[in-house]
């Protein structure tokens, strides 16, 4: 574990901000579990007054940093087009997102598949391989949550930094190596470690993600605790939390309600309990030394960009009303900062899914990586609609015969025989923001083949 020296800090960073309320308060007698903190700082331990914003500012202007590519955009986009585009999807788009192949009618969601942030990340990673054909290239995490794309990069010789017992082994990275930061971003501790190793950093972080980082840095500057709507183990949320000051991560409206009930002393719905139980519940989802009696007086909202839009908005409204009730409407601006960090691409795909479930379809096929948060929420919308919805990560989940292995929104793996009804069918189709069109086509081709065999057997 490296610790930033005073000399390095003075050379790179601006003077530390004035002491926060955390520095002024006495230490709490109850401490949160340190496991979350250790996962955030697996690569380096940073001093409390380390100016993360200034460090990031300086890093992005250094000679060993690139986030715009290397001048190979045209040829890498052509290669991606060859590998990931689909004639089936092209036909659907040319026919108003609906087309019939034999007994199968497919209705494609208006917004689906690769978002511009994902396409940008993959394209820059391809550029890095072309720019550094003979150098070792590492990824701090999967570039995106799609097994097809990740396997392609692996075949190109791009390696993931190894993980041992949940801790990344940065010792394998040497000076002169190339390290790609994925679309989800990377924790500031990881960036610091890589900068110290003098590697070439290729940053593919989605601009929407870095927008959330700016928001939590704003919270920190104003001495607000960041309430982050996300999954505490998700790469994006880990990175966002690393840029925050004091934070708590809530996965859903139920956890947000628990926090708000605690703020109101049990007067919301009575779901919360003692301070000790609060800290036990959120032991992996709070900043080190988090004290709910002190750190929930001034709060701001941020989110993992791939979470369900409606739930993020609901959480924001709930927290705002809670602070109004606790401190008075006239004082709410001193205790609450609203948010505007919902990703456009996530919102568009969710809105399109809400429209798709209103269509007359027999079932919905959701295609995307099983560790993809945004895809899980598309499946969630399908399940809530009552329409049979099947979330697969590749065409290999279909078959043999009329059988499918799919995941439910909450993660359960299910196998189902005869999932396709007999006779003519209409299928609604969508895909996650990390899913290439070719992966969707491959899945649909499996569906077409099952129905073709059905017709032949009936003849």
UniProtKB/Swiss-Prot annotation:
One of its GO terms (molecular function) is 4 iron, 4 sulfur cluster binding. Pfam families: LYTB. Binds 1 [4Fe-4S] cluster per subunit. [4Fe-4S] cluster binds at residues 115, 206, 343. Coiled coil: none annotated. It catalyses: isopentenyl diphosphate + 2 oxidized [2Fe-2S]-[ferredoxin] + H2O = (2E)-4-hydroxy-3-methylbut-2-enyl diphosphate + 2 reduced [2Fe-2S]-[ferredoxin] + 2 H(+); dimethylallyl diphosphate + 2 oxidized [2Fe-2S]-[ferredoxin] + H2O = (2E)-4-hydroxy-3-methylbut-2-enyl diphosphate + 2 reduced [2Fe-2S]-[ferredoxin] + 2 H(+). Its cofactor is [4Fe-4S] cluster. It comes from Oryza sativa subsp. japonica. It is found in: Plastid, Chloroplast stroma. This is 4-hydroxy-3-methylbut-2-enyl diphosphate reductase, chloroplastic. The lineage of its organism: Eukaryota, Viridiplantae, Streptophyta, Embryophyta, Tracheophyta. (2E)-4-hydroxy-3-methylbut-2-enyl diphosphate binds at residues 145, 234, 305, 372-374, 434. Homodimer.
């Amino acid at each position: 574990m490296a610790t930033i020296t005073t000399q390095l800090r003075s050379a790179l960073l601006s003077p530390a901000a004035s002491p926060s309320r955390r520095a002024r308060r006495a230490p709490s007698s109850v401490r949160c579990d340190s496991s979350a903190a250790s996962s955030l700082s697996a690569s380096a331990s940073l001093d409390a007054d380390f100016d993360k914003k200034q460090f990031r500012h300086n890093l992005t202007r250094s000679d060993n940093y690139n986030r715009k590519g290397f001048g190979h955009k045209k040829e890498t986009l052509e290669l991606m087009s060859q590998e990931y585009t689909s004639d089936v999807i092209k036909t659907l788009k040319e026919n108003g997102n609906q087309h019939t192949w034999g007994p199968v009618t497919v209705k494609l969601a208006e917004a689906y598949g690769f978002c511009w942030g994902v396409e940008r990340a993959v394209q820059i990673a391809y550029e890095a391989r072309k720019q550094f054909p003979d150098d070792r290239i590492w990824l701090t995490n999967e570039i995106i949550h799609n097994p097809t794309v990740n396997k392609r990069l692996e075949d190109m010789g791009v390696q993931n930094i190894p993980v041992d017992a949940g801790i990344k082994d940065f010792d394998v990275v040497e000076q002169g190596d190339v390290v790609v930061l994925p679309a989800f971003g990377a924790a500031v501790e990881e960036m610091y470690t890589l900068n110290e190793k003098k590697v070439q950093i290729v940053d593919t972080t989605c601009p929407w993600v870095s927008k959330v980082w700016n928001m939590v840095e704003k919270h920190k500057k104003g001495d607000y605790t960041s309430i982050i709507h996300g999954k505490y183990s998700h790469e994006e949320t880990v990175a966002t939390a690393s840029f925050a000051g004091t934070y708590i991560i809530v996965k859903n409206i139920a956890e947000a309600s628990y926090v708000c009930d605690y703020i109101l002393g049990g007067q919301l719905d009575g779901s919360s309990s003692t301070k000790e139980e609060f800290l036990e519940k959120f032991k992996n989802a709070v900043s080190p030394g988090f004290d709910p009696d002190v750190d929930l007086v001034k709060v701001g909202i941020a989110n993992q960009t791939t979470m369900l839009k409606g739930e993020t908005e609901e959480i924001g409204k709930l927290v705002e009303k809670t602070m109004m009730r606790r401190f008075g409407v006239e004082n709410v601006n001193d205790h609450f900062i609203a948010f505007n960090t919902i990703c456009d691409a996530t919102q568009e795909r969710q809105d399109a899914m809400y429209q798709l479930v209103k269509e007359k379809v027999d079932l919905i096929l959701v295609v995307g990586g099983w560790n993809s948060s945004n895809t899980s929420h598309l499946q969630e919308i399908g399940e809530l609609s009552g329409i049979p919805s099947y979330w697969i990560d590749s065409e290999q989940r279909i078959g043999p015969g009329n059988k499918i292995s799919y995941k439910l929104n909450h993660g359960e793996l299910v196998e189902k025989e005869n999932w396709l009804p007999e006779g003519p069918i209409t299928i609604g189709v969508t895909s996650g923001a990390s899913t290439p069109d070719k992966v969707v086509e491959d899945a649909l081709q499996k569906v077409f083949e099952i129905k073709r065999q059905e017709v032949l057997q009936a003849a």
